[in-house]
């Protein structure tokens, strides 16, 4: 290999691009505190979308600078890129965000070269970062009550102050102490070794701020999340205290927008979260704080490790076959893989470009805990032996432009991944009476909360919603979604004549964006009992005026409250 080849210069320019991205990422993230203090909710939504789009923008800029700075002959000689990787490793070894910089390098490589040139020699398919890092400055604050919970809580909130005052801190602290004693066994509150540990930085998302940490003794630990709200005109309010692991897991769910939080050493913060949420994969934790590209890297590493270490094979996902997407899964890996079919059902008035646009839209909007996050992949390559023959046959039949067999390898040219859930229609088939009621209640709430966040699902059939392991109903089929304000909700006109009333087809004109909520009941529910129950629970969804009222509120700039936790115990009635 030629010593004059500019490996070190290319590596430095890639890292300079990463530094530029990180600086802009930090600027947006650091503004979250001020947006919370000043109740700038619409600005918070815009900042969230801007931060998501930032990564691809900066990758594009860096790739363009590389093309400008180096000749095509030098830059595009892939055989020399192991030298670039080696030079890059030496540049990132002392960084506090070294694992993120590896993912950035991978993105630049993929922006330059086709995916069939991917190899661990040229990029970081496997990380070079040590699993155990050097000790660094503490990112947490620790408190020991030593029998005085009230005094400890006073100290906590003396440390976590904002430019806006707490509305009623003494009252909040009394309620907080009472809730803590109610949530934990009595012996824990009296344990002299009881310790409360909180991450030093506050996490921000939508209208909330969150203190995140844990409570522990020598024998046991509990996660701890304290959400704060800014009540405009009243001040900051402590809204809840959460110590249940399942409830904390929901706060960090794949259905939520990404937190904004200052994390000087990302790997250490993820390790901290992993201690309090051991059931969460680190891919999901990185994604939850906005590092979704690195979450994607960790997901891919987990996937290839699973395939290499198990006999699992891809099968078609259970449920009704999609009219636009074909969905397959690995039984032992909690994910579904979705590809766009070459031909859609005639009833679907969309094309491939529109479907891609809709799925990418979901990434940038507030999912309010009711839409599954997705990761988009290009040129997945899997061993042929890892596919059930029936699964592969179906994929090749419905999407031959996307799926191809190359020798002993299956190429998936484009797909999305989502968390696997139980389709709501299948869940209801096996649910008892109480479970049916609970699921339909949550199904209606999901539709309402999405609508209040300016999202209209379009196709609201039960099969397009899933039930998570925590029992929450989540929307996951996005080919017909639109902003609620784009839909035209109408009442069905009264018939003009007896002939109108008996007509098999609508006698009135219907525009492309028209929606008639009165038509929902028979469309959504084949089961008459479920239809009647849903009418009792959420009958207003059948009224066009309900939807129009939401549209008016959204156009007036109202940002709704959708809380990722049960609000009980702290706020006075």
UniProtKB/Swiss-Prot annotation:
Cite the binding residues for ATP: 317-323, 338
Q: Which GO terms describe its biological process?
A: glucose metabolic process; glyoxylate cycle; tricarboxylic acid cycle
The entry's keywords: ATP-binding, Cytoplasm, Glyoxylate bypass, Hydrolase, Kinase, Nucleotide-binding, Protein phosphatase, Serine/threonine-protein kinase, Transferase, Tricarboxylic acid cycle
One Pfam family of this protein, by short name? AceK_kinase
Quote the function comment for this protein. Answer: Bifunctional enzyme which can phosphorylate or dephosphorylate isocitrate dehydrogenase (IDH) on a specific serine residue. This is a regulatory mechanism which enables bacteria to bypass the Krebs cycle via the glyoxylate shunt in response to the source of carbon. When bacteria are grown on glucose, IDH is fully active and unphosphorylated, but when grown on acetate or ethanol, the activity of IDH declines drastically concomitant with its phosphorylation.
Q: Which family does it belong to?
A: Belongs to the AceK family.
Q: Name one GO molecular function term.
A: ATP binding
- Name of the molecule in the record: Isocitrate dehydrogenase kinase/phosphatase
